[in-house]
């Protein structure tokens, strides 16, 4: 190390995508070494004197917080809160993948090798790539979101008499922005079902109607343009009473495509990139992804 400093070699080692294995046209796995981590879930800086030095986390784009994700506490419910919009970084990175996204119908080694420079922008770790056809809907009302509906389902299971406290208003569960969600939870085994929500990385009101219409026409003609989502499985045992699993992610590219799919009621083609092995979904991450892929994996 001293020799490296003496020679002035302080630059970061280049990212390497390794152990690339395509399991099927809808599933692949790979690892990233020396990843740039430009898009990642990171712990907030500790507050001076705090007894919880690494507690809250945020989804960050080039170090700028986009969504507050909350802690790793397994008995706390998952909740996302919009903080700010990134400086188009997600779109710039994902745009380098667009050539094959126009009508993506299968994953292959050549495709993922071609995208190595983009995958190297991710955080160091092990990943799964899933090509999915997901029934999504756009939700703009708090009472329609799974963020609130899962809370009411827990209350019903607990025998709540309907006299909900003030802090259980729908707005208190709302992430602060319209987003896309699964039309129904994914049925599971150990965990009964998985909720799903994909959050935008750009203001929804900035979507161009002409672009949405163009993608809608392509979908109607039988094409399946793909969106790119960086996501993960989050497992919780809320209040030590309720098993709860989420597939949650940030849309890196394809906001217009997802809007077109949702408006047409056609399952959305999604390339999901999911880091596995760490965080609150560490135990059930692979299990949850396998259940989602079994139901919604793109059929060859």
Question: What does each model-identified segment do?
Answer:
Residues 254:
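Short, conserved phosphate/pyrophosphate- and ester-handling motifs at nucleotide-, phospho-/glycolipid
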Residues 30-250, 262-263, 267-269:
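Short alpha-helix boundary/capping and kink motifs at helix termini
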Residues 233, 273-278:
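Short beta-alpha junction loops
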């Amino acid at each position: 190390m001293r020799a490296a400093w003496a020679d002035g070699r302080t630059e970061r080692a280049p990212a390497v995508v390794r152990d690339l294995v395509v399991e099927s046209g809808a599933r692949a796995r790979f690892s990233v070494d020396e990843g740039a981590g430009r898009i990642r879930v990171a712990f907030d800086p500790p507050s001076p004197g705090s007894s919880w030095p690494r507690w809250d986390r945020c989804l960050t784009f080039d170090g700028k917080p986009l969504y507050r994700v909350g802690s790793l506490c397994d008995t706390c419910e998952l909740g996302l809160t919009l903080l700010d919009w990134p400086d188009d970084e997600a779109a710039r990175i994902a745009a380098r993948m667009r050539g094959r996204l126009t009508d993506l119908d299968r994953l292959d080694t050549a495709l993922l090798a071609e995208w190595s420079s983009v995958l190297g922008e991710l955080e160091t770790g092990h990943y799964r790539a899933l090509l999915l056809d997901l029934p999504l809907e756009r939700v703009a009302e708090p009472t329609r979101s799974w963020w609130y509906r899962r809370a009411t389902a827990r209350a019903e299971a607990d025998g709540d008499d309907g006299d909900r406290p003030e802090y259980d208003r729908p707005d208190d569960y709302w992430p602060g922005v319209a987003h896309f969600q699964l039309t129904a939870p994914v049925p599971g085994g150990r965990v009964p079902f998985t909720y799903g929500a994909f959050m935008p990385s750009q203001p929804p009101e900035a979507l161009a109607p002409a672009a949405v219409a163009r993608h809608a026409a392509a979908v109607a003609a039988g094409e399946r343009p793909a969106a790119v989502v960086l996501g993960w499985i989050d497992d919780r045992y809320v209040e030590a009473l309720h098993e709860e699993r989420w597939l949650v992610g940030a849309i890196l590219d394809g906001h217009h495509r997802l809007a077109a799919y949702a408006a047409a009621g056609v399952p959305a083609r999604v390339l999901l990139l999911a880091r596995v092995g760490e965080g609150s979904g560490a135990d059930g991450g692979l299990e949850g992804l396998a259940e989602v892929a079994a139901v919604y994996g793109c059929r060859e």
